[in-house]
């Protein structure tokens, strides 16, 4: 049986990995997953991102902790296969009053809500991270 929502699976693996104090987590790789992971790494929510080549490429994410606690307090899927959520540039949400990040898929690639607002782009809201 195929996976219905691979992005939700990725976010759940990050959440579970940090709850179990794992150093790194592995998952099947895709271009969108790598783009989301790169945004999270650039924002400082995860340590590093690596794509392991092979018959089936795997994405390895090294998780980040601060004083023994996970850096990611909450990670929540917004737009899902059954209900896509799109917002215009002036409707983009601020997560936790600007302390968190909304990951958005735009026509210019995957970026944060701040970067999308700056570029004047709207798009599909993939997830909220705080």
From Swiss-Prot:
SUPFAM superfamilies, A to Z: Ribosomal protein S8
Key words of the record: Ribonucleoprotein, Ribosomal protein, RNA-binding, rRNA-binding
PROSITE patterns associated with the record: RIBOSOMAL_S8
Gene3D superfamilies cross-referenced by the UniProt entry: 3.30.1370.30, 3.30.1490.10
Molecular function terms from GO: rRNA binding; structural constituent of ribosome
Keyword RNA-binding: yes
GO biological-process terms attached to the record: translation
One CC-aspect GO term: cytosolic small ribosomal subunit
Complex and partners: Part of the 30S ribosomal subunit. Contacts proteins S5 and S12.
UniProt record similarity statement: Belongs to the universal ribosomal protein uS8 family.
HAMAP family registered for this protein in UniProt: Ribosomal_uS8_B
Stored PANTHER family: 40S RIBOSOMAL PROTEIN S15A
Function: One of the primary rRNA binding proteins, it binds directly to 16S rRNA central domain where it helps coordinate assembly of the platform of the 30S subunit.
Protein name (Swiss-Prot/TrEMBL): Small ribosomal subunit protein uS8
Organism: Haemophilus influenzae (strain ATCC 51907 / DSM 11121 / KW20 / Rd)
Gene: rpsH
